Amino acid sequence: MKKNILKLRRIKYTDLSSDWVRWLNDKVVTKYSEKRFKRHTIKSQKDFLRDKLKSKSSLLFGIFFSDKHLGNVELSDISQIHKHCEIRYFIGKKDYWNKGIGAKSINKALNVAFNKLKLKKIYAFTYSNNLASQKVLKKNGFNIEGKMDNFFQYKN
């Protein structure tokens, strides 16, 4: 079996590592992520994983290349009633940025969403200045449907 192939597989507790936590605390990696607003620890990620692995409305995949965990792709807010979900993703290992891995990983996740879950619509959110993410989405057939100006979020 070839080791140098890109794999997407469901995340397991054993995938949790100090590298993963380091990625989440790296301001460059999380520049466009809501994860950037808090400090992450192994404990906080164990709690996060516990919730994700129990969830009926989310599928969290690890991105692996040469058996190295590079990042994650999540199909979240899955609605079988409305046949849609959101896709979220990140590559934590910066050495693998700009190599097409993000685009290929999203493609694999879309295959699961459309062919296994039988969803009809997948959506993603990205910042207008996150050109790399927009490029990855466009490569996978996404179109801009709208722009949220003056977006505010209530923080309790």
Summary of predicted features, one role per range:
Residues D51-S57, F142:
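Short loop/turn motifs at secondary-structure junctions and domain boundaries
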Residues M1-L16, D26, L60, F64-N156:
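Acyl-donor (CoA/ACP) binding surface of acyl/acetyltransferases
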Residues F48-D51, L75:
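Short, P/G- and charge-enriched loop/turn segments at secondary-structure junctions
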Residues R22-L24:
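Short Gly/aromatic-enriched secondary-structure transition segments
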Residues V29-L49:
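Conserved GNAT-fold acetyl-CoA-binding loop/helix
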Residues D19-W20, V29, Q45, I87:
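Hydrophobic pocket/interface hotspot
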